[in-house]
């Protein structure tokens, strides 16, 4: 079955969502409306186990997603970072190194104002 060819983007601006958990880093590039253009993760590249959580794997994932998005016409992104994983800084640097212009960086990690009590382990 043939792969569907993606169309060029109508606007060269978009949003980069970086979800950096303790075990994996997921990079999703969307248009300004929030529709996904492309995505990549440390696991989808081929890393398994503890190697997925490394900053190097996060950088490669961001670079892979950025190259596909640039081919489709993306030039400028707003970066939204979510999570406390080790790969978030490297992912941002890789997006810039791949050729995307970063206009803003937002940390959108949800932080409770002393909400629900966590289960045994995190306490």
Curated annotation (Swiss-Prot):
A GO term for molecular function: rRNA binding
GO cellular component, one term: ribonucleoprotein complex
Pfam families: Ribosomal_S11
InterPro entries: Ribosomal_uS11 (IPR001971), Ribosomal_uS11_bac-type (IPR019981), Ribosomal_uS11_CS (IPR018102), Ribosomal_uS11_sf (IPR036967)
Keyword check for Ribosomal protein: yes
KW Ribonucleoprotein (keyword) present: yes
Signal peptide span: none
GO terms classed as biological process: translation
Region (Disordered): 1-22
Alphabetical keyword list: Ribonucleoprotein, Ribosomal protein, RNA-binding, rRNA-binding
Family, similarity comment: Belongs to the universal ribosomal protein uS11 family.
Quaternary structure (record): Part of the 30S ribosomal subunit. Interacts with proteins S7 and S18. Binds to IF-3.
Role description: Located on the platform of the 30S subunit, it bridges several disparate RNA helices of the 16S rRNA. Forms part of the Shine-Dalgarno cleft in the 70S ribosome.
Name listed for the protein in its UniProt record: Small ribosomal subunit protein uS11
